[in-house]
Design a protein with these regions (language model features):
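Conserved beta-strand in the GNAT
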Residues: 56-58, 65-74, 84-86, 231-233, ...
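Conserved GNAT acetyl-CoA-binding A-motif
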Residues: 82, 110-123, 286-299
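Conserved beta-strand-loop-alpha-helix junction that forms the acyl-donor binding cleft
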Residues: 91-94, 119-129, 266-270, 295-308, ...
Length: 340
């Protein structure tokens, strides 16, 4: 098997091969969730979910056929001791040592970059989770995905939640936009995003520090993937300060799905049910602007009790569980070719 690095921004053939391999594994790896469309997948390989440098490697078997790939994310601002790994082998070519070879190759690259921990996620009960267990990887936490079916909202539940939220948040006004934040709001968005530091995270994982440049970079990645990003913020009526925000993205290639991204409330403004208010307002906005939506998917750490309670109040149903896995790079025998 030969493993070669490629540039997803210029090598569309390799990107398509990786997407086909990804799709082949979905019945086992992620049977319940929405697949990434070709444009979103290509944008992810090229740009990632964050601004950090990426390495994308494609494996070919002895006949030259693509059989697996991995994406290595190397954080540069925080968590410089860690590397995030996404690794997939074609469903028809599994259980033949290819995944182990790719893991060793990735570990070698991570070590060369000075990283000591590899991290990744695999659905509960999936081949990836079994592989991680075989490697004796640690599981420091678990994400839980939930789905809100928009065609059958829980009777009376959202109306009661709306009355509660509106009563508690009378000192705030709402503002909406699609796409990048207006110039007069982007600094406030960065400040509110900083509240994510309070969300549960793995031991030893450093919190992200948000600034305007990081917000703008995130917006550029969303635009490059062709996603429509609907944003609602709450502002303090007396000062105009941004107090909370929520964002839902829609992929035109999969118009029935809404992807709930971050929801955050700045510390000084907590206790006014702003998270609940914004999510209810977003449902109203999507009903008007994206009437084709049939469901919204979201994910939370299993320990994020507050946001889970809000999602339960709105009628989200548990879809599946995705443990995080960590492995010390030193525990993976590195592929010498990865150091070349």
């Amino acid at each position: 098997m030969k493993v070669e690095r490629f540039d997803p921004e210029t090598d569309g053939t390799s990107v398509r091969a990786c997407h086909e391999i990804y799709l082949s594994g979905l019945p086992d790896d992620d049977p319940l969730g929405p697949p990434m469309s070709p444009r979103v997948f290509a944008g992810w390989l090229a740009l990632g979910w964050t601004e950090d440098p990426l390495e994308t490697w494609l494996a070919r078997d002895d006949s030259g056929e693509p059989c697996g790939w991995y994406l290595l994310n190397l954080p540069q601002r925080e968590n410089r001791h860690r590397a995030s790994l996404e690794l997939t082998v074609h469903a028809a070519r599994r259980r033949a040592g290819r995944g182990t070879t790719l893991l060793r190759h990735a570990a070698g690259r991570a070590a060369q970059a000075g990283r000591t921990v590899l991290e990744g996620q695999a659905g509960e009960g999936s081949p990836g989770a079994a592989f991680a267990s075989t490697l004796k990887a640690r599981s420091p936490g678990t994400g839980v995905r939930r789905v809100l079916p928009l065609d059958r909202p829980p009777a009376g539940r959202q109306a009661a939640a709306r009355a509660e939220a509106e009563s508690a948040a009378r000192a705030y006004t709402l503002r909406t936009w699609v796409g990048p934040a207006p110039e007069d709001a982007v600094a406030g968005v960065a400040a509110v995003n900083g509240a994510l530091a309070d969300a549960p995270r793995a031991p030893g994982e450093e919190e992200q520090v948000w600034d305007v440049a990081r917000v703008r970079g995130d917006e550029r990645r969303v635009a490059a993937m062709g996603l429509r990003a609907h944003v609602i913020v709450a502002q303090a009526a007396t000062t105009g300060d941004l107090a909370a925000l929520t964002q839902v993205c829609v992929d035109p290639a999969m118009p029935e799905w809404g992807f709930q991204e971050l929801t955050a409330v700045a510390r000084p403004h907590r206790g006014h049910r702003l998270g609940l208010l914004l999510k209810l307002a977003m449902l109203d906005l999507l009903a008007a602007k994206e009437p084709q939506l049939t469901r919204i998917i979201t994910g939370n750490d299993v320990g994020n009790d507050h946001m889970i309670a809000i999602n339960d109040q709105l009628g989200f149903d548990v879809l599946d569980r995705w443990p995080w896995w960590e492995l010390d790079v030193a525990d993976v025998p590195a592929d010498l070719a990865a150091r070349a």
